[in-house]
């Protein structure tokens, strides 16, 4: 009887500790998420010298990034397949 009470109490303590730890991690999650969003936002502020997929371009000017080509039909950069 004493052993089962001890195990039940130990289980409750373990459950409390795990719940507290996961709750404290959840409180830190929004801060980490916001810091990552702002870090990505800072990266987007830098301008590239070339145009990426779906950006408008002028055929024949070679404005698209490597592995992309300006489509003469649609006038936007798309993946260059080598044809």
Swiss-Prot record:
Proregion span(s): 22-48
Q: According to its UniProt record, in which tissues is this protein expressed?
A: Expressed by the venom gland.
Q: Which residues are connected by disulfide bridges in this protein?
A: 50-65, 57-70, 64-77
- Molecular function as annotated in GO: ion channel inhibitor activity; sodium channel regulator activity; toxin activity
State the source organism's domain of life.
Answer: Eukaryota
> What are the protein's UniProt keywords?
Amidation, Disulfide bond, Ion channel impairing toxin, Knottin, Neurotoxin, Presynaptic neurotoxin, Secreted, Signal, Toxin, Voltage-gated sodium channel impairing toxin
SUPFAM superfamilies in the record, alphabetically? Answer: omega toxin-like
Q: Which residues carry this modification: Leucine amide?
A: 81
Q: Which GO terms describe its cellular component?
A: extracellular region; host cell presynaptic membrane
- Where is the protein found, in the record's own terms? Secreted
Cited InterPro entries: Huwentoxin-1, Huwentoxin_CS1
Give the signal peptide, or none.
Answer: 1-21
Against Pfam families, the record matches this protein to:
Toxin_12 (PF07740)
User: Any miscellaneous information on file?
Assistant: Negative results: has no activity on Nav1.4, Nav1.5, Nav1.8 and Nav1.9 sodium and calcium currents.
- Entry comment, domain topic: The presence of a 'disulfide through disulfide knot' structurally defines this protein as a knottin.
Assembly description: Monomer.
User: What exactly does this protein do?
Assistant: Selective antagonist of neuronal tetrodotoxin (TTX)-sensitive voltage-gated sodium channels (IC(50)=1270 nM on Nav1.1/SCN1A, 270 nM on Nav1.2/SCN2A, 491 nM on Nav1.3/SCN3A and 232 nM on Nav1.7/SCN9A). This toxin suppress Nav1.7 current amplitude without significantly altering the activation, inactivation, and repriming kinetics. Short extreme depolarizations partially activate the toxin-bound channel, indicating voltage-dependent inhibition of this toxin. This toxin increases the deactivation of the Nav1.7 current after extreme depolarizations.
Query: What's this protein's family per the entry?
Result: Belongs to the neurotoxin 10 (Hwtx-1) family. 15 (Hntx-3) subfamily.
Q: What is this protein called?
A: Hainantoxin-III 1
Q: What is the lineage of its organism?
A: Eukaryota, Metazoa, Ecdysozoa, Arthropoda, Chelicerata
């Amino acid at each position: 009887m004493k052993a089962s009470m001890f195990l039940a109490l130990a289980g409750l303590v373990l459950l409390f500790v795990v719940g507290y730890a996961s709750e404290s991690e959840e409180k830190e999650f929004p801060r980490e998420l916001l810091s990552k969003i702002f870090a990505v936002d800072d990266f987007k502020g830098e301008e590239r010298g070339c145009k990426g997929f779906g950006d408008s371009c002028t055929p024949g000017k070679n404005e698209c990034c490597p592995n992309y080509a300006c489509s003469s039909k649609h006038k936007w950069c798309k993946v260059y397949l080598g044809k």
